[in-house]
């Protein structure tokens, strides 16, 4: 997972890129770098191992001014943590940054004879050299070159690209890996995450897969693979910049722990009719729950653990099989899935690559997909048959807190509605389930209010060599 950002416009690009990278640093902090056109329309690259603060020191030592550039913060996948492996990568006329994995990079290295050209151990540099070759072959036509280029790639990618002879322009393209873009009075922006854009605009669009985006200081254009211009669907961010700031907390994780009660309220209360769960506004019909004879929960990481808790709740109540699969393995299981299977897909970002691929497989086998996601307009949300949006706001800390809590709440509400619809409980029992769920909110506020007591307890706990966390049934998995 890496963070990427691009900007072209009237503002000073280097400061904007560095500020954007600071907001994306949770996506990677092994190394960071920027590339930009200077006042002589030459591309300059500055990159180093370490955090964005170290990069900022290097950038500030130069006297350059720029109005167009790209930036990247990295978690290493291909190649170690070195200056050479840091992005951006340059090859001939091409400078690019990349988020994703090029699975056929070795074959491309052989096919293009790149063994003696490469200065890094990354798949991304291989991609840069391939694009440079097809750029020359295309007569230096960016759209034609990028179309040819992506046909040669296997894997996931989000690219931002500078061409030496196109100062002031940025080109972007993606497959699976997330990219969002926007045009504002301050210029044109593209990034891997909304947190890098929110200071400048609340309106944005998700870059469509297999489409090319051309950013100039005055406009953003989106083209399909036949070079037809398309108008992307514009979306609006539902949270403000304060939600992406620490606001006096020492770190994002503590801030997001304190935000859990409000996140639960925002997720639960709009979906209550009387004291019963109601998904009419979400467009989730009761027929979906009546027509299934098994449930497959598909997720990764923390979201998968939320799914395991849900299985412990659902199976005894609904009396149908519930299977939880880690998304990265689902494709290799030869899963028993058909149109009578309800696939519940969980992803905070809505862009988790393995989860997206698993959902696509489940849908291809006939299963309707109901996704639980936190980001409006994300790829998983757009490709699902039905969406349950949680309303946790941005979660920036790597360790999940409020996103996990609202995922549990969403699954609990879905379980309650399924049980009511299938006759596994009556309205009084369903109402009691929801009262129990709502009681979690004040209980959580009480616990957060005891921070000083908890700190005192933790001082004793950290001295212990062994700690046992004991639970039964669903609590085991929490």
Question: Where on the chain are the PLM-derived regions?
Answer:
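Glycine-rich phosphate-binding loops that contact phosphosugars or nucleotide phosphates
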Residues: 290-439, 476
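Cofactor-binding loop segments of dinucleotide-utilizing enzymes, especially the Rossmann-like FAD-
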Residues: 7-9, 39, 99-101, 164, ...
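Short beta-strand segments
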Residues: 71-72, 97-98, 160-162, 173-174, ...
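Conserved adenylation A10 loop of the ANL superfamily
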Residues: 257, 477-478
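Acidic catalytic cores of enzymes that act on phosphate-bearing nucleotides/polynucleotides
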Residues: 462-475
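Conserved beta-strand elements of the Class I
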Residues: 95, 171, 296, 342-344, ...
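Short acidic (Asp/Glu) and glycine-rich catalytic loops that position anionic groups and cofactors
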Residues: 1, 108, 174, 243-246, ...
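Conserved short alpha-helical segments that host acidic/polar catalytic motifs at enzyme active sites
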Residues: 1-251, 255, 259-294, 332, ...
């Amino acid at each position: 997972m890496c963070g990427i950002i691009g900007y072209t416009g009237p503002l000073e690009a280097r400061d904007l890129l560095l500020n954007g990278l600071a907001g994306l640093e949770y996506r990677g902090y092994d190394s960071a770098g920027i590339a930009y056109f200077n006042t002589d329309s030459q591309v300059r690259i500055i990159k180093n191992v370490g955090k964005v603060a170290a990069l900022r020191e290097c950038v500030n030592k130069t006297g350059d001014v720029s109005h167009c550039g790209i930036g990247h913060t990295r978690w290493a996948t291909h190649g170690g943590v070195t200056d050479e492996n840091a992005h951006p990568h340059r090859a001939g006329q091409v400078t690019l940054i990349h988020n994703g994995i090029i699975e056929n990079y070795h074959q491309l290295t052989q096919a293009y004879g790149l063994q003696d050209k490469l200065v890094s151990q990354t798949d991304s540099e291989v991609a840069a050299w391939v694009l440079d070759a097809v750029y020359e072959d295309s007569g230096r036509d960016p759209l034609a070159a990028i179309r040819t280029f992506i046909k040669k790639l296997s894997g996931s990618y989000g690219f931002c690209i500078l061409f030496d002879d196109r100062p002031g322009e940025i080109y972007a393209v993606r497959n699976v890996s997330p990219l969002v873009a926007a045009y504002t009075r301050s210029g044109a922006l593209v990034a891997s995450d909304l947190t890098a854009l929110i200071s400048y605009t609340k309106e944005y669009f998700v870059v469509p897969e297999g489409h090319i985006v051309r950013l100039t200081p005055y406009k953003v254009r989106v083209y399909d693979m036949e070079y037809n211009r398309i108008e992307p669907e514009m979306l609006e961010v539902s949270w403000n910049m304060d939600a992406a700031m620490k606001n006096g907390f020492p770190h994002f994780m503590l801030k997001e722990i304190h935000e859990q009660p409000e996140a639960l309220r925002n997720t639960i209360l709009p979906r209550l009719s009387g004291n019963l769960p109601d998904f009419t506004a979400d467009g989730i019909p009761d027929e979906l729950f009546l027509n299934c004879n098994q449930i497959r929960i598909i997720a990764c990481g923390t979201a998968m653990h939320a799914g395991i808790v849900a299985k412990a709740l659902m199976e005894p109540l609904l009396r149908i099989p519930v299977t939880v699969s880690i998304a990265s393995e689902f494709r290799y299981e030869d899963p028993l899935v058909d149109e009578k299977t309800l696939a519940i897909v969980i992803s905070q970002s809505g862009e988790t690559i393995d989860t997206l691929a698993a959902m696509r497989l489940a849908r291809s086998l006939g299963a309707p997909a109901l996704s639980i996601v936190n980001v409006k307009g994300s790829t998983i949300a757009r490709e699902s048959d039905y969406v349950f949006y949680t309303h946790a706001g941005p979660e920036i800390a790597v360790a999940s807190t409020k996103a996990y809590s609202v995922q549990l709440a969403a699954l609990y509400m879905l379980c309650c509605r399924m049980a009511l619809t299938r006759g596994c409980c009556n309205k009084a029992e369903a109402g009691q389930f929801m009262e129990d769920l709502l009681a979690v909110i004040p209980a959580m506020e009480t616990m957060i209010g005891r921070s000083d007591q908890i700190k005192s307890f933790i001082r004793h706990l950290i001295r212990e060599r062994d700690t046992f966390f004991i639970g039964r049934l669903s609590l085991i998995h929490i």
